[in-house]
Amino acid sequence: MASRGGGGGGDGNSPPPSVSSPDVRPSSPLPATNSSPPQSGRRGGGRRRRGSASPYPSSPSLGGFETPPHPGRRTPSGGAAARQQRQNWTGGRFPPTPSTPMSTDDVPLSSEAGDEDTPETDGGGGGGAGADATPVFVWGTNISVQDVNAAILRFLRHFRDPRDAGRVDPVMDEGKYMRAIHRILELEGGESLDVNAHDVFDHDPDLYGKMVRYPLEVLAIFDIVLMDLVARIEPLFEKHIQTRIYNLKSSVCLRNLNPSDIEKMVSIKGMIIRCSSVIPELKEAVFRCLVCGFYSEPVMVDRGRVTEPHICQKEQCKATNSMTLVHNRCRFADKQIIKLQETPDEIPEGGTPHTVSVLMHDKLVDAGKPGDRVEITGIYRAMSIRVGPTQRTVKSIFKTYIDCLHIKKTDKSRLHVEDSMETDNPNANKTTEDDFLRDKVEKLKELSKLPDIYDRLTRSLAPNIWELDDVKRGLLCQLFGGNALRLPSGASFRGDINILLVGDPGTSKSQLLQYMHKLSPRGIYTSGRGSSAVGLTAYVTKDPETGETVLESGALVLSDKGVCCIDEFDKMSDNARSMLHEVMEQQTVSIAKAGIIASLNARTSVLACANPTESRYNPRLSVIDNIHLPPTLLSRFDLIYLILDKADEQTDRRLAKHIVSLHFENPNIEELEVLDLPTLVAYISYARKHIQPQLSDEAAEELTRGYVEMRKRGNSPGSRKKVITATARQIESLIRLSEALARMRFSEMVEVQDVVEAFRLLEVAMQQSATDHATGTIDMDLIMTGISASERQRRDNLVAATRNLVMEKMQLGGPSVRMIELLEEIRKQSSMEVHLHDLRGALGTLMTEGAVVIHGDSVKRV
């Protein structure tokens, strides 16, 4: 093994090795950068994500102070290439940087002969050492490169999953990660090997500690050992495979990250709130001479700096300062910056959420989207900030960010249906967890075959809330949802169900919202009093890193394909409420401001709750009059439930017993079977992902017949009033409810029983919210316009009676008459009760027709 010394004056054949001192120096944020030299002459497929230039775009020609300190580690794609690379180093082809300690990339590869776990050093390229070479240490530490190499090799070859211990299968005799490597080679896909950090700890705790404390050095050795194994198994395999570590033993809260974590591997959980566009990052630069047109050899980017050749390398030219960058011959890598924010359950009392920038590279780009709750494993880094763009002086305060190694979506209870990291070939990273997931799916399918699964799901939804069974059934339908339909003509029909809860204070509305927020696959909980229009949809802001104008997603956009819970819906501003019209029907958010014209997806179900304006619901008034919501918005809700607090001795006693029983254990109470929260979430998630029910012929006939029957109720023979009891939006709601009920049974077909139950749920909601109290019948005009058909008829009759009275009693151009006198005359002629405000409304209608003129309390015919 040829190691590189720190001096610049050796012959290169046998430089002195770097030996650690007895007292190990700690890896501080900046001195740790000396553990890896620039390596400006190296080429090949490398670990770009660990040697990124900076998360903040800057010119590569800027100084090293503007970029993160560690260089890009570019490991060769095979054992032979690694030996050739070391020969190039020791042979003088790429001379070492003076006064720079040894690079940890100079790692001895394991022996190619036999299955020995102890690696042998290569003696290549003029001056290599033999088997008794002096141990090589990572600069500033007591980590022996040979020991780490051997430990990693033993781990990859021999680690076996404890769950495979009892299985009699010849395939399981091979190590877990050797099987994963073979799978990658067989599928010829996947450029990464996911390594569970728990497995590393179980196999070798010392290796785990070194990997967490010195991730750059240890992971570079990991990659070289991995590619050496790949080269033995498949010598012709050309792709470079990287190691991605995940699932550390401890996860750090965002607000607990401190300077002692810099340059260490950390695991954090949070929610993605913003993703930047994909940024091309220069990795290899090619220059062309402006005098002779000669193209230079590719120049590697070293810590954000591009070393431009000063002299043309062509013997016949040798022109100075004539080289220019050729962009279309350079090599770029994908880079993306995401903003990670603390989840609400991790924010302490009275605190505000903390955020951190995360740098994604290559295959990790677009692995997460805004609104996802993720766990990120990466290296906590610090970057200096210049005082000015043209000055090399830097500030004493550094910017911190995380260099991402692995990303996965959290919520294990959702069976990974939306939680696995997006890759080009997801089959390449499958492990033995597939068997575990298959067992859980079988259990869920057995649950779906139970005859009482509908009632059991209803009892499992918010079991601490007493009764409200029909409300819970409607909320269950919202969680399961219907099928979104898109026709070839471009027309689309939403599959999400919107529900509004209206009721008296203290009727568990907010608790239902909180429980739904826990169950929804993704979503945001917000309050109407503290929400603005742009906070709900999207707003334009300046990117703090690039200074560009960017769109920040609001609550509805972050809840895409989930449930957005809005509390205190009645207290929202009119401007904020008006933004919901497009979201609730077209499920998009259109933005046209600050030069940005965009349409964002907001395919979310809206669950809102509102209190009456007078604190108590007034049954004599309509829903619109009680909560002062515009009819155009109210009609977009599929189900509107009234939850009223009515005084009843028997009901009050049962409710009190239920609430008291929650605070102590009573062995005499018989508990009904319910599903626990993880099982319920998994059940809902699997149904939404894999069950796509279609309408059967019988169900379609029942839908048509039931809708026509509902319309007939408002057109009873002999009645002069034509009441609208159903609209086209109701039949769309019925289809969505029927599909959701079929999903609860894991059925691919919507049956007649689903349609019948959907009609019952809709009628229960309509009887509460759309019943005309004057006639006792359902009148959809209450929802569509806020005025029932009977009320409209009464107003028309009053206008006609007032017009006749004015024509009879008042002369054209004669003296005016007081309103009180008109009111008394109308009361004498009419049997119905008439109030002064009713008369004012009728006279206002006549004034718009030009029949009368109103002056204060006097009326004059014109």
Swiss-Prot record:
Pfam entry (one): MCM
UniProt-annotated location(s): Nucleus
Compositionally biased residues, Gly residues: 1-12
Gene of this entry: MCM4
Motif position, Arginine finger: 635-638
Chemical reaction(s) catalysed: ATP + H2O = ADP + phosphate + H(+)
Signal sequence bounds: none
EC nos: 3.6.4.12
Chief localisation class: nucleus
Residue pairs linked by disulfide bridges in the UniProt entry: none
GO biological process: DNA replication; DNA strand elongation involved in DNA replication; double-strand break repair via break-induced replication; mitotic DNA replication initiation; pollen development
Record function comment: Probable component of the MCM2-7 complex (MCM complex) that may function as a DNA helicase and which is essential to undergo a single round of replication initiation and elongation per cell cycle in eukaryotic cells.
Family affiliation: Belongs to the MCM family.
Cellular component aspect of the GO annotation: chromatin; MCM complex; nucleus; THO complex
Name this protein carries in UniProt: DNA replication licensing factor MCM4
Assembly and oligomerization: Component of the minichromosome maintenance (MCM) complex, a heterotetramer composed of MCM2, MCM3, MCM4, MCM5, MCM6 and MCM7.
Biased composition (Low complexity): 20-41, 52-64
SMART domains according to UniProt: AAA (SM00382), MCM (SM00350)
